[in-house]
């Protein structure tokens, strides 16, 4: 996605670096990963990052409206509703797929919204391992807040 950084990353990639990276991920906390880990991080260009952030802001504006719970109550069948649910979730995860629009530009499309922190720790570990074993530019962050 970010062509210059992608080219530099690919040019410097070696199977040995990837194996060392996997070793870090699998041994850092005593529990090996049970799924395939991608050889490379995703390098998101600034314009796509801004589109992602705008999408998050738009979704949050809807789900934090005072009337949202009332309007969405029928979306969850009574037999799977959670008793004593908090007014707002502590965690919010928005998963986006990256597609091309009619003009060929990269654009995010919401895939899923979750209210639990299932992968936060692993994603931080993964980002740190990429930095340890590969030359990731210092101004690229895995957290949008920097």
Which sequence ranges carry the predicted segments?
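Preference for protein termini
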Residues: 1-146
């Amino acid at each position: 996605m970010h062509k210059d950084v992608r080219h530099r990353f690919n040019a410097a990639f070696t199977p040995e670096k990837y194996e060392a990276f996997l070793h870090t991920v699998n041994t850092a906390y005593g529990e090996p990963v049970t799924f395939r880990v991608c050889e490379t991080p995703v390098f998101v260009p600034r314009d796509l990052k801004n589109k992602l952030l705008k999408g998050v802001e738009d979704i949050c504006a809807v789900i934090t409206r005072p009337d949202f719970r009332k309007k969405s109550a029928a979306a969850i069948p009574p037999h799977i509703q959670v008793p004593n649910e908090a007014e707002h979730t502590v965690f919010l995860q928005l998963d986006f797929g990256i597609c091309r629009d009619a003009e060929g530009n990269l654009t995010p499309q919401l895939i899923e919204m979750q209210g639990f922190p299932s992968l936060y720790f692993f994603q931080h570990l993964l980002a740190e391992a990429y930095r340890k074993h590969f030359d990731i530019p210092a101004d690229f962050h895995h957290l949008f807040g920097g």
